[in-house]
Swiss-Prot record:
Gene3D superfamilies: Bromodomain-like, SAND domain-like, Zinc/RING finger domain, C3HC4 (zinc finger). It comes from Homo sapiens. Residues 525-529 are annotated as: Nuclear hormone receptor interaction. Disulfide bonds: none annotated. Residues 276-296 have a biased composition (Basic residues). SMART domains: BROMO, PHD, SAND. This is Sp110 nuclear body protein. Residues 159-168, 190-204 have a biased composition (Polar residues). It is linked to Hepatic venoocclusive disease with immunodeficiency: Autosomal recessive primary immunodeficiency associated with hepatic vascular occlusion and fibrosis. The immunodeficiency is characterized by severe hypogammaglobulinemia, combined T and B-cell immunodeficiency, absent lymph node germinal centers, and absent tissue plasma cells. Induction: By IFNG/IFN-gamma and all-trans retinoic acid (ATRA). A motif (Nuclear localization signal) lies at residues 281-294, 428-444. (Microbial infection) Isoform 3 interacts with HCV core protein.
């Protein structure tokens, strides 16, 4: 389990937003996903009932789930993920397992980052203040020591550590990577001073004898990885403090020059160092031998610097030699390239001249070749080319007639073989085209029979899963509207591709028509591009504010559809789609049984075939009774036939009466198909008493 933080919750929410479409397509059936959300009070009873009704109305389950997830974004919390990835859901929807693992990876990554956050500790900052003042220290996570860095200070667990523990920490041996530099012995807050006054040293020695050293704030000393830098620091140390009777004395140094006045050390101790802001703190336990050696340092420092400069010069000379060698190699390669280009040009010129000489043939034999005149004094590159041409002409003239005749015969034979091969290839291509066309027709028929259109895919969604051979991806409709040259398909690796590139990835060399090869659940992309929603109402054939059906391209006004459509509902299926679904499984019943039952929603919508006629019955009254669900089947059929009968009697002598008769015949035909009953009398229509 992970400890939930604000950052982790935000990361899980962003990951939920990205994986929302994948979750929707992973859930392929309503039960038990909807029931789990309802039992855990994540969705309301009303949302649950609307979702089930949408699934019954042939709305794809994936689109219903996507609609639920978008509404749950406002109240996102950890309980939603717990319910979503429960053991029951993971068992019923296997595709959720990969999405669940991705959420676990996000939580694990943020849990690891929370472990690596710095820990705030407090430690005393001053010598005289002891543990009264504390400053927080951010200690990084433990890392393996590197040769270029000095060992880090140990972790301070309590602010009031004893003086013995601080002495033990200070007396630890340094790491083998930095044997020259000792650990700092005495550190003040923010500054280091060089002490040269005898009074100040005596005061410090007295304080050391009288009082114990308080716990000190350990710090790290930045040391370069080069071996020369510690030597330079040892050699460039300033003069040593005067000898004290106590033997060892902690020395505090600064890069600033030594003061001349006796009052300056106090002023220097109160001002920070000016040179690069670096603190150089060392504790040197001086002995008479070391002091004697250090007094003779000023002369040795110059020699050490001189040696360092020599080493640096040697290091600089090595890359210079390498650069010279690389320059020489590049010059040689350029010269070789120039030579090869000249040789190629001369060979091509010889071949061209030879072919021209062979083509002329008889002319060269009959007329003696006259040498070309070359003007003297032409100092240009063309002069050398003309000389080469003369040499080539002489060589070609010496060729025998036999060789020329043999070459001509070889060329004729090659031309004949090429023509024969081309004719054979053309015949083979024609045969292949005929066979492939017949095979394609046969394969098309098989493909259409074997892969029917899927009812679970919402083709009106902005993202559609597409396939082409072995390649799989998601098509984004908004990007597809800008043209087929736009990268609108994202494959499984996350790369964006155009339809042609996606087809090449799936089909390889056989990619010829992306509209036919790219498919979405049994439908080609070309068929999906042709499907567009109508701009007119299916009932009244007028425009305005229309509502689109979720399963077909029909549109309706809110009042034209029976029953009326709620404008707030986004997922619904029209009555025509429900009629189509029920007509396939409709059984044929007798008239008496059919007329006795109550009208159902799919029975209430019959096409409006005529203009309203206000006599004894009119269409508005029929529509009102259908909306209020007052009709039985017999009552509805009687009102409709009464309206046709009145129309027939009113328009006897006009051609408009024949239109009413045709509409009546069409109505009776649709009535049989929708209600599913057969007539007992074969002659004429069945009439009510």
């Amino acid at each position: 389990m992970f400890t939930m933080t604000r950052a982790m919750e935000e990361a899980l929410f962003q990951h939920f937003m990205h994986q929302k479409l994948g979750i929707a397509y992973a859930i392929h059936k309503p039960f038990p996903f909807f029931e789990g959300l309802l039992d855990n009070s994540i969705i309301t009873k009303r949302m649950y009932m609307e979702s089930l009704e949408a699934c019954r109305n042939l709305i794809p389950v994936s689109r219903v789930v996507h609609n639920i997830l978008t509404q749950l974004e406002r109240t996102f919390n950890l309980s939603l993920l717990v319910t979503l990835f429960s053991q029951i859901n993971l068992r019923e929807y296997p595709n959720l397992v990969t999405i669940y693992r991705s959420f676990k990876r996000v939580g694990a990554s943020y849990e690891w980052q929370s472990r690596d956050t710095p820990i705030l500790l407090e430690a005393p900052t001053g010598l005289a203040e002891g543990s009264s003042l504390h400053t927080p220290l951010a200690l990084p996570p433990p890392q393996p020591p590197q040769p270029s860095c000095s060992p880090c200070a140990p972790r301070v667990s309590e602010p009031g550590t004893s003086s013995q523990q601080s002495d033990e920490i200070l007396s630890e041996s340094p790491s083998p990577s930095d044997p020259v530099l000792p650990l700092p012995a005495l550190i003040q807050e923010g500054r280091s001073t060089s002490v040269t006054n005898d009074k100040l040293t005596s005061k410090m020695n007295a304080e050391e004898d009288s009082e114990e050293m308080p716990s000190l704030l350990t710090s790290t000393v930045q040391v370069a990885s080069d071996n020369l830098i510690p030597q330079i620091r040892d050699k460039e140390d300033p003069q040593e403090m005067p000898h004290s009777p106590l033997g060892s004395m902690p020395e505090i140094r600064d890069n600033s020059p030594e003061p001349n006045d006796p009052e300056e050390p106090q002023e220097v101790s109160s001002t920070p160092s000016d040179k690069k802001g670096k603190k150089r703190k060392r504790c040197i336990w001086s002995t008479p031998k070391r002091r004697h050696k250090k007094k003779s340092l000023p002369g040795g420092t110059a020699s050490s610097r001189h040696g360092i400069q020599k080493k640096l010069k040697r290091v600089d000379q090595v890359p210079q030699k390498k650069d010279d060698s690389t320059c020489n190699s590049t010059v040689e390669t350029r010269a070789q390239k120039a030579r090869t280009e000249c040789a190629r040009k001369s060979r091509s010129e010889e071949i061209i001249d030879g072919t021209s000489e062979m083509n002329e043939g008889k002319r060269s034999q009959k007329t003696p070749s006259t040498p070309r005149r070359v003007t003297q004094g032409a100092a240009s590159p063309g002069h050398g080319i003309q000389e080469k041409l003369q040499v080539v002409d002489k060589v070609t003239q010496r060729k025998d007639d036999s060789t020329w005749n043999s070459e001509v015969m070889m060329r004729v034979q090659k031309a004949r073989t090429k023509c024969a091969r081309k004719s054979r290839l053309k015949e083979k291509k024609k045969e292949k085209d005929i066979c492939s066309s017949s095979k394609r027709r046969f394969q098309k028929n098989i493909h259409r029979r074997g892969k029917p259109k899927s009812d679970t895919v919402d083709f009106h969604c902005s993202k559609l899963p597409v396939t082409c051979g072995e390649a799989k991806g998601i098509l984004y409709k908004k990007k597809m509207k800008h043209g087929s040259s736009v990268k609108c398909i994202r494959n499984e690796d996350g790369t964006w591709l155009t339809p042609n590139e996606f087809e090449v990835e799936g089909k390889g060399r056989n990619a010829k028509n992306w509209k036919r090869n790219i498919r979405c659940e049994g439908m080609t992309l070309g068929e999906l591009l042709k499907r567009k929603n109508s701009d007119e109402c299916e009932v009244c054939c007028q425009g305005g504010q229309l509502l689109c059906c979720g399963t077909c391209p029909r549109v309706f006004h809110e009042d034209c559809h029976i029953p009326p459509v709620e404008a707030k509902r986004m997922l619904w299926s029209c009555t025509f789609c429900r009629m189509k679904r029920s007509s396939g499984s409709q059984q044929c019943h007798h008239v008496s049984k059919t007329l006795e039952r109550q009208m159902q929603p799919q029975d209430q919508l019959i096409r409006d075939y005529g203009e309203p006629f206000q006599e004894a019955m009119w269409l508005d009254l029929v529509k009102e009774r259908l909306i209020t669900e007052m009709y039985t089947v017999a009552w509805f059929v009687r009102d409709m036939r009464l309206m046709f009968r009145n129309h027939k009697t009113f328009y006897k002598a006009s051609d408009f009466g024949q239109v009413g008769l045709d509409l009546e015949a069409e109505f009776e035909k649709d009535l049989k198909d929708v209600l599913g009953f057969h007539e007992a009398n074969d002659g004429g229509f069945w009439t009510l008493p």
